Regions:
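Structural micro-motif
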Residues: 62, 113-133
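Thiol-based oxidoreductase modules, predominantly thioredoxin-like and allied folds used
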Residues: 88-112
Length: 171
């Protein structure tokens, strides 16, 4: 008698546990933003930025330098938004895009921070950061460059509107 009761209890526990695990996985990976892992380590990140500035000068575009890391969900979300159909079309039309891996600057393990300093951003409080540059290297969004740490929570329209406005901003 105890064996059938124990077997029933174990079966019920397995079903409940599987349901809880499935719910946890859905919650952990179910989100309302696209994701991309675009922050590869480059041997010459500054060279990548310089090349984007040169292309921007030739093509009459601006440059977006996204400074983030693949470990960061907001960095992955921002990379995903920039590759989405609507925002990606704007970026392709108006910008040269460069992703720069910066590690974990908030914990003292930052990389390529000299790139931000070159454009007048001395402190990167976290990831990601989005620098919009003119073709001659002027930082056009000094007031918002380091405010992208909530990229996963931003709405598509808000991201699009900000990038569209920066594409038109007078220098």
């Amino acid at each position: 008698m105890i064996k059938p009761v124990l077997a029933g209890f174990l079966a019920a526990a397995a079903v409940i546990g599987a349901g809880m695990l499935a719910g946890a996985l859905t919650h952990a990976h179910g989100h309302d933003y696209p994701e991309a892992r675009s922050y590869a380590v480059s041997d010459d990140a500054m060279g990548d930025v310089e090349a984007a500035l040169a292309r921007a000068g030739e093509n009459g575009k601006r440059v977006i330098v996204v400074m983030g890391a693949n470990w960061c969900h907001d960095s992955r979300a921002l990379a995903g938004w920039l590759a989405s159909e609507r925002i990606g079309a704007l970026v392709d039309d108006r910008y040269e895009l460069v992703f720069v891996n910066i590690g974990m600057p908030q914990s003292g393990d930052g990389h390529n921070l000299h790139i931000a300093r070159r454009f007048g951003v001395d402190d990167l409080p976290g990831t990601p950061n989005l620098l919009v540059l003119s073709a001659d290297g002027a930082l056009l969004n000094r007031d918002t460059a380091t405010t992208w740490r909530n990229a996963a929570s931003r709405e598509e329209d808000a991201i699009y509107d900000e990038l569209a406005a920066l594409a038109r901003k007078a220098i």
